[in-house]
Amino acid sequence: MDQVTRRAWAYVSRVAEPPNQLLADLVAREGVVAAAERIRSRNVDRRLLRATEARHEIDSAADDLDVLDRMGGRLLTEDDDEWPYLAFTGFRSADHEKRPHALAPLVLWALGPSRLRDIADRSAAIVGTRAATPYGEYVTADLAAGLVERDVAVVSGGAYGIDGAAHRATLASEGETVAVLAAGLDVSYPAGHSALFHRIGKHGLVVSEYPPGTRPTRRQFLTRNRLVAALGRATVVVEAGVRSGAANTAAWADALGRRVCAVPGPITSSASVGCHVLIREEKAILVTRAAEVVELVGMVGELAPDRGRPACELDELSSKELAVYEALPGRGARSVEEIAVTAGMPATEVLGPLTMLNVRGLAIQEEGCWKLAKR
């Protein structure tokens, strides 16, 4: 890939909040270099104009690629032979009316010796609560070690709790693991997993849809979950609440035609409530051993039916309200223009959500700027 093309891919990776179907269609139709130039010159569809309004003048592609190169990483697109075409086919058949974000990534930023396509062909995702119990961590380690014995790679999201236990157990067993981040490759989140991400980058693979320097938001975690589900030929939920990120990943797996599994736990444990609900409602297959997961991974050609499950972790905020809420700083205040850039929205579309957040008691305005309300 020449430098002009590489910079164009890096530019489109940042210019609109992913995934964006309009941007993907433009790149497919015009080529990435021409698409990037049309966005810069504002010669695009009205809807894409709005989606790229806040960031089209922010061209940090050269800096982003410099960070990537210094880390020893690489940029992956569908033009690369490492691109996991088969893993992403589920996005084509998903119900896009129910799940508008059921789209393959446009670009992936990657770090590590493992090849994504090879891993996706023989992988299982293990996900669960951040507040894992000793039981949950034990089961996770046992499952991960058993999968490694059977040459199955482990995909997870790099969070505290079950995710971290899955990554650590896989590395300890000398297997391959993939951490799918909701932040840039150079942003260790959670910070306590910085050393773990370094180890994964040395022995497995760390991937992200977001360019360097991107800080994670709740919306990005939910968007990231679709990739965890897509890259695992089966998704195993070890411990989870009813409304949780793990339950959201399980819902994505089902929507993409992947097998969903859940590990039962003590009936007195709140950490296992989400797993029990999935099993009771027949939204997941009960598993207790790695061999059972491997059997299901081998059945990936038989797609699970779409049961029309609603999203599991959506509160009363609309998508725009959530984006604006996440753009507000943890401390201090920001102007409307600054909020628009962070949220990836036109400034004219930020005021409405800010007003609704104010009505809900979530945000307040002081001296022309906005900040989170104390709760």
Where are the regions a protein language model picked out?
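Short, small/acidic-rich helices and loops at N termini and domain boundaries
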Residues: M1-H96, R360-C369, A373-R375
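Glycine-biased, small-residue-rich flexible motifs in mid-sequence functional cores and linkers
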Residues: M1-T5, E17, D79-R375
